[in-house]
């Protein structure tokens, strides 16, 4: 469907649609974001108006849209030619930065299109900053962020740019003036592939409610009134303790964006009663998208979940030229790990094989995935398994060779252009992982099962000319370390390797201060048991610390909590295994864990790609509730639509690493599918650089 006109207006106007039908009598409101916390009260910019019989509207002129903030528009209630007003309909369109829309108080953009598709894009991209208040024609969409997660990135304040990033995503998915999703991210040729078929399907699902007269009775997570709106609201009630059932279309889509695996209940055949039938919430939602749906080209079968996955395919990145250090850089290939810096820039570690690599390199991208650089295809240091960023402008990795090979080197690159700044030997055997503290020091351990000492590269010099001095510290392990993490006080957790069903987690206290961390005490240890395999060659491992100083560790069977017990002396104890959300038989892997801003733990599962891969997510505050495995759909130019139905067609086949940005998006690299996947808004906003060692949402 085309937009209403391409002629610029002095005041915002446009048209509202429910599918093919225009929305009459809908309440139109123009808002701007504010810097008053997550989902804080909206700022109304102009008096409300209503849509006419053609769905058209024009708002008052002379609008003062605040500098540094973002504008959006909503349509509440109205009817699409039915017998009565639908008080459950609430749609919106994200417009963008005030300074891009207005010259002084004069609107300089085009007429706006508001419908279900623009609502889907806004809900997924902006959901972490959005709340809904009021009801019916008085319903309000509040979009706000703390000052320190609005638009300015800084390590000295510190601050992030989550709201700016979220609006960038919304405008990169769907054109606000035509209501049409783009084929590629930001409508740029060769960029990430947008799942427009899934967006159309979600639009048709919303349309079933918008183009009705609304609900007729009570709707809960367990039952509904049988209306399209009632079914939508039941199926999008979050699967967490104490969750409220939504009462309008915007709230329903916000829930689905953040909980893409909806209600775990099974439902009756008519999708009205939970608990006794065989229908899933996903199939019930799919059933709302009828053959009369206005949005052409939707998925023709239910997806495995409702995650919105944008996929950058093999070969994307800097290929040749000034920012490619060799003519064979090649872009994304066998993507092995992903890291973010404090500005939400993205770094992908590449190789060509998981078992017999012949090279490694690093590709750097901006937050919008504009290619920035690619390091040379390094054929000497081919065993870098992970990369990390510091807060001084570097991305680095340690080559995991044996000490006898002489190739276990720390390699440090500039994040500005990918130039190699430092290559210095790491005097230990097969270091797999390294963590960076807030002072840019690098802590690492050997993965050798014969034992290892904690080592540190102390940072010095400048960003352009860094130096690193290595030292051996007091804490020692009897086995090899697979993963390390720092808690908020710079205490260290390590997960040891094991080839049995028992493995160890170790803890070393920071015996100095935060400003001058020191590690003068031995590791304290706890053992965990379950369906695990943590020897050096398999791929099941991971550990993260939370805001309270406890840790969560992963293995092939699932997730374990490690609790820090108050001393003196401080000790740690391990909890029971929390199983993966889906049982894969013997093909289970869970590794490279990450903690989002709400404290949820996530990590890629199923490394071998033999079955459907994805990102497993746990709500640890809700007793370790497994929220599901997020997969999404990949609309490939070559193979068509792949919705994670088999291992070979999943958007994430053999996912090897994940990271979360300040907007709450999950970035996932997958080796077998040779790509980078962005799950829009599927986590909570997070401080993007692990080296900031900050927990919780950016505030």
PLM region descriptions:
Residues 284-699:
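Flexible "stalk/tail and boundary" regions
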Residues 1-327, 331-334, 342:
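Feature for extracytoplasmic/surface-facing segments of secreted or surface-associated proteins
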């Amino acid at each position: 469907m085309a937009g209403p006109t391409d002629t610029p207006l002095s005041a915002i106007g446009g048209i509202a649609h429910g599918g093919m039908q225009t929305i009459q009598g809908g309440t139109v409101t123009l808002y701007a974001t504010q810097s008053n916390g997550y989902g804080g009260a909206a700022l109304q910019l102009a008096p409300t108006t209503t849509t006419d019989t053609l769905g058209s509207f024009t708002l008052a002129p002379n609008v003062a849209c605040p500098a540094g903030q973002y504008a959006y528009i909503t349509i509440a209630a109205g009817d699409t030619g039915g017998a009565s007003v639908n008080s459950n309909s609430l749609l919106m369109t994200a417009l963008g930065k005030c300074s891009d829309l207005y010259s002084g108080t004069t609107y300089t953009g085009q007429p706006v299109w508001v419908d279900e598709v623009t609502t889907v894009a806004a809900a997924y991209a902006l959901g972490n900053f959005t709340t809904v208040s009021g009801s019916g024609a008085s319903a309000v969409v509040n979009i706000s962020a703390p000052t320190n997660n609005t638009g300015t990135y800084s390590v000295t304040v510190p601050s992030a740019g989550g709201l700016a990033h979220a609006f960038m995503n919304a405008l990169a998915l769907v054109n606000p003036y035509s209501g049409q999703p783009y084929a590629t991210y930001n409508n740029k040729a060769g960029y990430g592939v947008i799942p427009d078929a899934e967006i159309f399907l979600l639009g048709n699902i919303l349309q079933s409610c918008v183009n009705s007269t609304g609900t007729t009775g009570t709707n809960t997570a367990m039952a509904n009134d049988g209306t399209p709106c009632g079914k939508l609201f039941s199926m999008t009630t979050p699967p967490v303790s104490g969750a409220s059932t939504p009462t309008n279309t915007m709230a329903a889509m916000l829930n689905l964006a953040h909980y893409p695996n909806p209600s775990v209940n099974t439902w009756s055949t008519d999708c009205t009663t939970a608990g006794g039938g065989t229908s899933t919430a996903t199939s019930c939602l799919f059933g709302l998208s009828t053959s009369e749906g206005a949005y052409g080209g939707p998925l023709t079968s239910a997806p495995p979940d409702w995650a919105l996955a944008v996929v950058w395919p093999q070969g994307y990145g800097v290929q040749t030229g000034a920012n490619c250090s060799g003519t064979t850089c090649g872009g994304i290939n066998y993507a092995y790990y992903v890291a973010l810096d404090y500005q939400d820039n993205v770094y992908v570690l590449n190789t060509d094989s998981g078992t017999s690599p012949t090279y490694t390199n690093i590709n750097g991208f901006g937050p919008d995935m504009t290619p920035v650089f690619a390091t040379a295809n390094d054929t000497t240091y081919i065993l870098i398994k992970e990369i990390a960023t510091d807060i001084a402008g570097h991305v680095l990795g340690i080559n995991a060779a044996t000490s006898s090979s002489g190739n276990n080197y720390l390699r440090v690159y500039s994040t500005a252009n990918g130039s190699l700044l430092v290559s210095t030997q790491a005097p230990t055997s097969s270091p797999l992982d390294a963590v960076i503290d807030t002072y840019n020091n690098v802590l690492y351990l050997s993965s050798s099962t014969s034992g290892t000492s904690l080592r540190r590269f102390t940072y010095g010099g400048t960003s352009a000319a860094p130096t690193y001095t290595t030292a051996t510290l007091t804490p020692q392990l009897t086995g090899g370390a697979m993963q390390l993490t720092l808690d908020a006080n710079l205490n260290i957790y390590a997960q040891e390797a094991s080839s049995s069903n028992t493995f160890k987690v170790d803890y070393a206290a920071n015996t100095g201060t935060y400003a001058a961390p020191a590690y003068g005490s031995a590791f304290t240890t706890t053992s965990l048991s379950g369906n695990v395999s943590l020897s050096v060659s398999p791929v099941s491992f991971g550990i993260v610390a939370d805001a309270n100083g406890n840790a969560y560790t992963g293995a092939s069977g699932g997730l374990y909590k490690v609790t820090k017990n108050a001393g003196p002396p401080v000790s740690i104890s391990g909890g029971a295994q929390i199983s993966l959300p889906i049982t894969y038989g013997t093909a289970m892997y869970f590794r490279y864990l990450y903690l989002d801003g709400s404290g949820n733990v996530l990590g890629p599962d199923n490394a071998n790609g033999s079955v459907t891969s994805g990102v497993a997510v746990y709500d640890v505050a809700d007793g370790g509730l497994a929220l599901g495995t997020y997969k999404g759909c990949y609309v490939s130019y070559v193979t068509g639509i792949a919705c994670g139905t088999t291992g070979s067609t999943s958007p994430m086949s053999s996912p090897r690493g994940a990271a979360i940005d300040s907007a709450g998006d999950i970035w996932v690299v997958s080796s077998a599918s040779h790509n980078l996947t962005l799950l829009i808004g599927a986590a909570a906003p997070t401080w993007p650089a692990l080296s900031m060692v900050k927990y919780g949402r950016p505030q």
